[in-house]
Amino acid sequence: MELEIADPAFRDRLSAPAYHVRQHNGCSYWNARLVRRDVPARYVGATHEYLSVDGPAERLDAIAFADHACGSSRKEKVERDLALLSAALAANPADARSMFYLAQTLRDAGRHAEARDGYAKRIEAGGWDEEVWYAMLMHARSCLALGDAVGFVDGCLSAYEFRPTRAEPLADLARYYRERGQNETAMLWVEAGRRIPYPEGDALFVDEGVYRHAFLAEAGIAGYYCKSPERRRAAHEATLELQLRRDVPDAVRGLARRNGMFYAPSADALFGAATRVPLALPMDEPYAPMNPSVMLDGDDLVAVIRGVNYRLGDPERSWPRLPAIRTRNHLARLERDGTAREAREIVPAPSIPPAAPSLVVGFEDLRLFRWRGRLHACATVRDRNPAMRCEIALLALDDDARIVELALLHGYRDDLHQKNWMPAVDGDELMFVYLCDPTIVLRYDPAARRVAVHREHAPALALDHLRGGSQLVRFDHGWLALTHEVAMIDEANRRYLHRFVFFDRDFRVSAITEPFRFADEPIEFAAGLAYDATRDAVLASYGVQDCRAMMATIDAAAVRRALVALPGSAGRPETARA
């Protein structure tokens, strides 16, 4: 048991004879915990004792107890409680509380038929309406455990009729019908349950998850299969909400993120028709283009296009058949239709130290930018240390696409594999957004050739699944970037989705779009972004299936409209400019 103190000054305001305090472990209930010394009180019950107070008691919201269920072993407790409660009922057969907890203990022991009968006896005994209602709900659940579907449905309906201010029976019905593929019926119970507010006045066994997230989670699954566009839209919105809620369990949030791949719109559906062009360069076999990074260099459109020697899904051209995974990069100046005016392979100048022997060779997924008058890129590299650990390399390029300076960016979490840092050129400073939740901004010190934490922010929503994608580019009053997230279909298959993320001037996440997809194929990765203010257009470059390099031109006004402000933030660009 852990005491949680929301208001440390609560002691100064204690004046009532006694106080009820909330205890919770996903299920919430209130019982007397603080009693003045002169107030008569006694413990009641053979087990699951509670403190009975003579006289009035108030609720104390300033503290609570988190129950981590760390008491005696479950088996020993069940056996002990069965003996104590059976003895109590033998002495007093009308003891309604002992009836209730005997049924509860039989349920915990997996003796569902006896539990069902025990709950029926407690219902018949009457008395405290909350305990009677809970016995009705548990009687229904015991029927379901015994395969009695009719008894379960009837029991849930009876429990709801008895206490329509409690939504737990409707959550059970929604799950029951959804698990049986009756999704339209499930949505009826979802819609009814969502209209029931949290029962603030109830003291016994309030399932907090039902009122916080259960109906949203059920809607996100069942609504996908409904015929009604309104229900499908509500299901999509429920899934988007759960993906970002901090106050739901990790498993619920994770399920919503996985389910998000089924709802994710195409970029065209979200932003209007985008112009797509391939960024194709002639590459020697066996290399194929992927994961380009575009930027606007003045009026010039410039891109780094990565070429790789492996092929997804081809065992003969994948690890471990290949002796090494190799990357070659080309710097290209492009027309707006994606054709290259000129292209040169990026190679180290003779002054750059040679790479170490490695099974993964070359600079991966460059992000291109201009800093201090020179083209630069940051990349992941594995062939600069004997352990083949992923490191971030900062590359300075000359006009002939030669790497004339190389710095490995150490100084923050050097013990981890590092990938996908997002560069931002802020005047004379070079920053990197390392994570979105918390938003960690690293500053590069060119004299020391190291990075250090410059800023750290905690966004209002859960954004821990957003991973680095493009550069950060100036956009309206802040910065715009593309991030990616991965939905795992199973252990071997995954789906990539992207979001536009808007940062304020101080690199706080201010607004995000919903996740979307550039392509209809599962593997896509955006590493480049540019904002063309003259045309008010966003240029996004991305790879598809690790074998195609693409660029999309998107209406910037549509991006602004799709960005949704985070609570407490400066807002989306359109709002801030108005």
PLM regions: where:
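Residue at a conserved register position within TPR or TPR-like alpha-solenoid repeats
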Residues: 106, 143, 177, 222-223, ...
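Catalytic-site signature of metal-activated, phosphate-bearing donor transferases
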Residues: 2-117, 127
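Start-of-helix register in tetratricopeptide repeats
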Residues: 97, 130-134, 168, 209, ...
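Beta-rich carbohydrate-recognition and catalytic domains
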Residues: 265-287, 296-358, 370-464, 474-522, ...
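Short coil turns that delineate tetratricopeptide repeat
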Residues: 93, 127-130, 164, 198, ...
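"A position-specific structural signal for the A-helix of alpha-solenoid helical repeats
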Residues: 101, 138, 172-175, 179, ...
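Single-residue signature of alpha-solenoid repeat helices
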Residues: 81, 115, 152, 186, ...
